[in-house]
């Protein structure tokens, strides 16, 4: 078993939780792009390997950043959503975006990324609050649909 040293400060703690190469990209895909399924996350442009994705999802779940929804107990029905703690990583994602925004070659950005860049530069606070609100509504709707599905399954 790997022994992880206890963090010595708040920044070390945060890096221990989210500082690997993949965790913030997974949180980005969940919160900004509303991806919920393993396959959707695996197919992101960064091409994360399946074993690494599974490991990071488990770590994010254990650390309270995401919740695993599994209505039928099958891999195909499994979805991942950000928790309140996970949604709180959005400002970190935005700050990293702002940190790199002036040095990134815009030709590598797709239309969605260019739109996000424009919105963040225009009004970062509005962008952040709108995205949080949209994601919370999305998750509420998803959970409502899953509850209906479970209820129908019980009736049959």
What are these regions (language model features)?
Residues 5, 14-17, 29-30, 64-70, ...:
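Short, contiguous, well-ordered secondary-structure segments
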Residues 91-156:
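C-terminal regulatory/oligomerization modules of transcriptional regulators
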Residues 34, 64, 100-104:
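A general structural signal marking secondary-structure boundaries and capping sites
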Residues 39, 58, 78:
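Residues within the helices of the helix-turn-helix
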Residues 44-75:
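Canonical helix-turn-helix DNA-binding module
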Residues 1-9:
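A detector for short, charged/polar N-terminal pre-domain segments
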Residues 9-49:
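N-terminal helix-turn-helix DNA-binding core of bacterial DNA-binding proteins
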Residues 19, 72-96:
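Basic, amphipathic "hinge/linker" alpha-helix immediately C-terminal to the N-terminal HTH DNA-binding motif
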């Amino acid at each position: 078993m790997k022994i992880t040293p206890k963090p010595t400060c708040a920044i070390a703690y945060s890096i221990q939780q989210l500082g690997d190469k993949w965790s913030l990209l997974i949180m980005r895909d969940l919160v900004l792009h509303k991806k919920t399924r393993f396959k959707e996350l695996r197919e992101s442009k960064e091409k994360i390997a399946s074993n690494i994705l599974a490991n990071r999802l488990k770590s994010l779940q254990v650390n309270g950043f995401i919740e695993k929804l599994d209505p039928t107990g099958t891999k195909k029905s499994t979805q991942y959503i950000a928790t309140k703690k996970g949604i709180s990583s959005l400002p970190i994602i935005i700050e990293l975006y702002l940190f790199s925004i002036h040095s990134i070659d815009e030709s590598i950005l797709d239309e969605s990324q260019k739109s996000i860049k424009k919105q963040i530069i225009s009004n970062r606070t509005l962008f952040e609050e709108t995205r949080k609100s949209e994601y919370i509504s999305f998750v509420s709707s998803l959970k409502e649909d899953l509850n209906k599905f479970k209820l129908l399954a019980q009736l049959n």
